[in-house]
């Protein structure tokens, strides 16, 4: 059963960001659906995607001189640190904590997309395509 649905509410109209967000939803749902035996490996795949996703956003924000970069990056860092700690504890047998993370992340993600990422994509659109090209270079 999905814990989060990719929907218009999460759609920002920015192709790269929307693709990352759709993958985030798909992978988080895979963690939610994973058996206990497969939970940690599904969480590993989710964390690996999220590391790349957040690093990409961080690079875009830095290249575009996004004013609240540090606040946005700190939120990314905190969520990744939490996911890594929960992964460690789930690998040690604390599946209840792992399952709790999966049920609580969707609310955080929806708020993050609506506030933080919406501001970021608006800023990037105003700065033009060069901001992302600089980040990719």
Swiss-Prot record:
Organism domain of life: Bacteria
UniProt cross-references to Gene3D superfamilies, sorted A to Z: Hemerythrin-like (1.20.120.50)
Transmembrane segments: none
Binding site for Fe cation 1: 21, 53, 57, 117
Cross-referenced SUPFAM superfamilies: Hemerythrin-like
Signal sequence, renumbered to the chain: none
Lineage: Bacteria, Pseudomonadati, Pseudomonadota, Betaproteobacteria, Burkholderiales
Family under the similarity heading: Belongs to the hemerythrin family.
GO MF assignments: iron ion binding; oxygen carrier activity
Name assigned to this protein: Bacteriohemerythrin
Gene source species: Ralstonia nicotianae (strain ATCC BAA-1114 / GMI1000) (Ralstonia solanacearum)
Function comment: Oxygen-binding protein. May be involved in a storage mechanism or for delivery to oxygen-requiring enzymes. The oxygen-binding site contains two iron atoms.
Keyword hit for Transcription regulation: no
NCBIfam families according to UniProt: hemeryth_dom, PRK01917.1
Subunit text: Monomer.
The keyword Lipoprotein is annotated on this UniProt entry: no
